[in-house]
Amino acid sequence: MALERRKANTIPVSWSQEDEKLLLSYLKKESFDAKFLKELFPNRTLPGIRSKVRKLRIKHDLFGESYRGQKEDFTSKVAQKIKPKSVFDAYAGAGHQTFKWIAIADIVYASEKMKSKLKQFEKTAKTNGFTKVDTGDCLWKLFKKENKQILFFIGDAVDAAADLKVNNLHIDLVDLDTCGSTLPILPTLLVLLKPKHIVITHGEFHSMRFKREDVLRRLFMHRDIGENPLPMNVDEMSKELDKAVKIAALRAHNETSDSFWLSLEDETWLGGRFHGMLRRYYKVSKPSATSDCINELSNS
C-alpha cells in the first residue's frame, strides 16, 4: 500500500511569550505527558506541542536530562574499560558525553551542527576546568586543560570526519549519540575513521513508538523498502537494530576485507525499555569470510 505524505491540517498558531514560559517551566520539572499538555494548551494540536517541546529542549539543553546520569555512567564505564586515546564525538551537543570521554582520553574531536550549541559547550567546558584557546578562523575550536585537548567543529559530522581523514588523524572510538538515527551515516564514518570501537544511541525507538513507518522504511536499509517493518515490540526492535548496525558495517566497503564486523559488547537502557532509548557499545574488527558473516546475520 502506498504511503501518504504527512502534512499539517491546521493553520500554525504562534506561541506567546507567556505560553512558551509556561511550557518551559513544565519541561524543567516534569517529563512529557501528552494528555496533561493537551489540557494545558487546549487550542493547540498535539503535533504542534511536540514540535515546540523539541525546540525548547534543544535550546535550553533539556534533551535527555532525565536519563543524563545513566548515559554518563555508561560512557564512563566504556571509557574505563577500553581506555581510548582519541575519540570522535559526532553529535556533541552541549558536551555532556564529550567531557566524560576526555576524563580518560588524551584528545576528543567533537562536532555539532547547531551553532547555538557552541555557547552551551563553552559553558560545560568552563565547568569542567577547560580553557578556550584562540584559534582564529580555524574550523576547530580548541579547549585545553593541562595535557588534555578538545577540538570542537561547528558543522556536519561527515564534514568533520572527512577533515580528520584528510589530516590522517587516528581515532580509537566514535560516539554516535543523537535522539534520531545514525544508521545511514555509520558506513561512511567507519570507512573514513576506521575506529576500533563504536558507541551508538538508538533514537529509532521513538519512530517505532510513534508508528513512523515511513522513517523506519528509509532507515532499515537491510530490509525491503516496500515492506512495512511495523508492528514491532521492544525486543524485536532491539534485535532489528543490532542486525541493521552489523549489516551496515559489513557493507561499508566494496570488499569484505575492507569492511567491518561489529560485536555487541555492552548496552544500557536510557529512560526505561518502554519510554527511552538503547545505548550500545560495539567492538570493531575485520570480518571473517563473507559466508560466515552472512550465516551469522541470517540466523540472528
Model-flagged regions — what are they?
Residues E39-P42, W101-I107, K123-N128, K144, ...:
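Short, surface-exposed basic-aromatic patches at helix termini and helix-loop junctions that form
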Residues A2-E4, L40, L46, R57-D61, ...:
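Structural alpha-beta junctions
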Residues A2-R6, L46-I104, A110-N168:
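S-adenosyl-L-methionine
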